Amino acid sequence: MERYVVTPHEGIGSLKLGMSPEEILAAVQNDVADLKIFSKRGIQISQTRERDANFQTLRYMEDIYFSMVRYQNGKAIEISVDRELRDEVKVSLYDLDVFHTPAEDVIRFMKQIGPCIHDEPDEQLSTEYEFPALGIRFWRERAFHEKLLLDRAYVEAMQLVLEEEKRYLYFDIVTVRP
């Protein structure tokens, strides 16, 4: 497998909206085998309990592979994959590598296709970006933008971890929903 394709309103790779947990697990197992990711533990699955019993969220983990699927009434309604895959497989949306392309460039490109909602007043320093018309959401743990380097107080305060902060120029997770 060379590429994990993100398809709006449909899915990511072989993980498709509308699949049951059993179908998703089979798809994850096939993808992990195709990626030649093996560990002694096998695929680990963890569940998040939700207040509404009609919903559940399952996380599928195997070494560098991590996906999260939210289900409603036993059918996938949201599928996410994590950036840890980026060195093994290209995760692409409209041929754009979503984990190797700076977040600012991803958002600029996606805004040509559909409107964007972000979680902070300063779009460049947001951590979550949603494109409702496309059923696509991007997330990063923290925001970082080169303009922060113009703030002397920020640079001094962040001196020890500044190189690490630059990883937040990129997204951590891409999600597909209906």
What are these regions (language model features)?
Residues 1-11, 32-98, 113-178:
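Amphipathic N-proximal alpha-helical interface segments
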Residues 15-35, 99-116:
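Amphipathic alpha-helical segments
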